[in-house]
A protein has these predicted regions:
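Flexible, glycine-rich active-site loops centered on histidine and acidic residues
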Residues: 66, 70, 87, 296-298
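Intrinsic-disorder/low-complexity, polar/charged segments
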Residues: 33, 85-86, 145, 278
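Basic, amphipathic N-terminal segments that precede the first structured/catalytic domain
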Residues: 19-20, 24-37, 89-106, 110, ...
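Glycine-rich, aromatic-flanked loop segments that form ligand/cofactor-binding clefts
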Residues: 2-12, 50-80, 99-144
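Glycine-/small-residue-rich beta-strand-loop submotif within the FAD-binding core of flavoenzymes
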Residues: 21-24, 70-96, 146-151, 253
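Active-site loop segments of alpha/beta catalytic cores
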Residues: 101-329
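N-terminal basic, low-complexity leaders that serve as flexible interaction/assembly modules and, when applicable
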Residues: 1-68, 72-74, 291, 313-329
Length: 329
């Protein structure tokens, strides 16, 4: 059978249709209007030969539901105006019911399923993982060194434990609610976990990712667990949970697959920047990923992280077609 392909962040700024919509609406407006979220989710499905849709959402609204003031600032990205810096800050945080705090994404999932079902294309729901959400919440936005969040993790164990416990509940319940709303696959994104030493991951992060995935697993749908820069802790990511482990481009995918063993499928791992290259450069890179996984049970072809804003649409189209043609021979 042809290899399955989906692409992280497959809806978004590289598509003209999305840029048109953004002239009128801010990103949070789109996410919080289920009809618009469905429209954006469907844009790549209508344009490319993809095997799955990914709900158009963002990892940060769960933090808003907990009481943080989120704003997307043009040119800066997300900013949280009241970051979490102390035990008192942690204690103030709510653990909201996702059906109330995140109703818009759940409604978007229901609506999108109505459109996708006749096409026979499944819908993927997702959430940020506890550590990645903590990183945004403590830093107050994106960060180069993640010194504030790591300082809390190392220096304030009580605050850290309480915070990560709250986050794991929120994330687990949110993923569960997405599956109940109709998501047929769930993905946990731990985008910043590669900033950690493996020991710190094992002792101070992994138990909470595991807890979130255990809560979500009650839904009985396949789960993808993805982090970037995880070569130092691949086996730990696997042991935290997930049926599919996503890997980035910084490791040969066959090496990652060998380390992960046969209990999980593997997703990845083309460098997103390869999509900027001319086709004669892009094609052999895609071929290499597929050849390295040939004959292995369970591979989802994907990028090693999110698709970048200026990505040429023609290359995305050709890549989707190529993956299906090459693997169905």
């Amino acid at each position: 059978p042809a290899c399955r392909i989906s692409q992280m962040g497959q809806a978004g700024r590289y598509m003209t249709e999305y840029r048109e919509l953004r002239k009128t609406y801010g990103i949070l407006d789109i996410i919080k209007t289920p009809e618009l979220a469905r429209e954006v989710t469907m844009q790549p499905i209508n344009a490319f030969d993809l095997d799955a849709a990914i709900i158009f959402a963002d990892i940060l609204p769960p933090l808003e539901g907990m009481g943080l003031d989120l704003e997307f600032i043009k040119g800066e990205g997300p900013v949280l105006h009241n970051p979490v810096r102390s035990l008192a800050d942690v204690e103030r945080l709510a653990t909201p019911d996702p059906k109330e705090a995140l109703w818009f994404t759940l409604d978007a999932i229901k609506l999108t399923r109505e459109t996708l079902d006749p096409l026979g294309i499944p819908l993927i729901g997702f959430s940020g993982a506890p550590f990645t959400l903590a990183a945004y919440a403590v830093e107050g936005g994106g960060s180069k060194n993640h010194d504030k969040v790591k300082s809390m993790m190392m220096g304030e164990p009580d605050a850290w434990h309480q915070f990560m416990t709250k986050l794991s509940d929120v994330v687990g319940q949110y993923m569960l609610a997405q599956a109940e709303a109709g998501a047929q696959v769930l993905q946990l994104f731990d985008s910043w976990v590669g900033q950690l030493a493996p020991d710190d991951y094992r002792e101070r992060v992994m138990p909470y990712s595991k807890r979130a995935l255990e809560i979500a697993s009650e839904a009985g749908v396949p789960m993808i667990h993805f982090g970037t820069n995880t070569n130092g802790m691949l086996e730990d990511i696997r042991d935290a949970g997930g049926d599919v482990i996503g890997v980035d481009w910084r490791i040969d995918i066959d090496v990652a697959a060998k380390r992960l063993g046969n209990s999980v499928a593997v997703q990845g791992n083309l460098d997103p920047v390869a999509l900027f290259a001319p086709w004669q450069e892009l094609e052999p890179r895609a071929k290499t990923v597929l050849d390295r996984m040939q004959g292995r049970h369970g591979h989802i072809f994907n990028l090693g992280h999110g698709i970048l804003p200026q990505t040429p649409v023609d290359n995305v189209k050709r890549l989707c077609e190529f993956v299906h043609e090459y693997t169905s021979k």
